[in-house]
Amino acid sequence: MKTTFLDFEQPIAELEAKIEELRFVQDDSAVDISEEIERLSKKSQQLTKDLYANLTPWQVSQIARHPQRPYTLDYVAELFTDFHELHGDRAFADDLSIVGGLARFGGHPCMVIGHQKGRDTKERAARNFGMPRPEGYRKAERLMRLAEKFGLPIFTFVDTPGAYPGIGAEERGQSEAIGRNLYVMAELKTPIITTVIGEGGSGGALAIAVADTVMMLQFSTYSVISPEGCASILWKSAAKAPEAAEALGLTAHRLKALGLIDKIINEPLGGAHRDPKGMAALLRRALADSLRQFQGMSIDALRERRFERLMAYGKFKETTPGA
């Protein structure tokens, strides 16, 4: 598949186009231009390194939304075996924006749950662009309860702009479904490992992200609102999204510094979409390390650790009026 370049990557795109042109010429010519191709390839690689070493939060947001970025089912295919998808919330419908099911990780049974976007227009519409409705969160809760019953560790993958704000979703109890998931996950008697693989949009992300450890891919984001939404509220213009992204502190490095996540998983040069298999290998190692950390831990110790982790979020200072 031909790589789609973002606006700020145009210098790289131009170099890559030149390299492709030279390769095409070399195939139909007796002239050896391999040295020139190699020189330009090295230049492109260095340019990518320099560009990605100085990304703004807004540029990171764009990478997190890249249309070729691996989604949950892509990682399921690479990291897990014997995946058997489970459907429906047993109350209303099957929401395709949340996928989940039984699988094996490293030969051990587990439960996998994650947001799922689509690749083409038809699939994007079917999966509601990765924005779950209440039935999606209730399906996730059902699978979590099932995992708890059989003592299976839970892996969740976050990639959503946010919970769907439609009238029907609100009528069916969107806020209740999200709130219940937060409550349930805080008390589950089994390990929960969460990875933000793309967008981590507000409560829609948090509803499957109350975990024993939360990791983020290097160029993923996690925030209470999208930069465009924040800009529209504070500046009355979505054009202020770059400033909003800076103010939100939505990058992995910022959140790690604040203690809101536990680990950052580095991505291949140019982002996960440039080397999905390489990204999967890095993620596999991180998931295995996290799971190993909780194996052998008693249920009481696991839940106590999770509770302490949740209570450590945020800081406040008490002051006396007039002091």
From Swiss-Prot:
Pfam families named in the record: ACCA
Compartment(s) where it occurs, according to its Swiss-Prot or TrEMBL record: Cytoplasm
GO BP annotations listed: fatty acid biosynthetic process; malonyl-CoA biosynthetic process
Key words, A-Z: ATP-binding, Cytoplasm, Fatty acid biosynthesis, Fatty acid metabolism, Lipid biosynthesis, Lipid metabolism, Nucleotide-binding, Transferase
Complex formation: Acetyl-CoA carboxylase is a heterohexamer composed of biotin carboxyl carrier protein (AccB), biotin carboxylase (AccC) and two subunits each of ACCase subunit alpha (AccA) and ACCase subunit beta (AccD).
Role of this protein: Component of the acetyl coenzyme A carboxylase (ACC) complex. First, biotin carboxylase catalyzes the carboxylation of biotin on its carrier protein (BCCP) and then the CO(2) group is transferred by the carboxyltransferase to acetyl-CoA to form malonyl-CoA.
Protein's name according to its UniProt entry: Acetyl-coenzyme A carboxylase carboxyl transferase subunit alpha
Species, as recorded: Burkholderia multivorans (strain ATCC 17616 / 249)
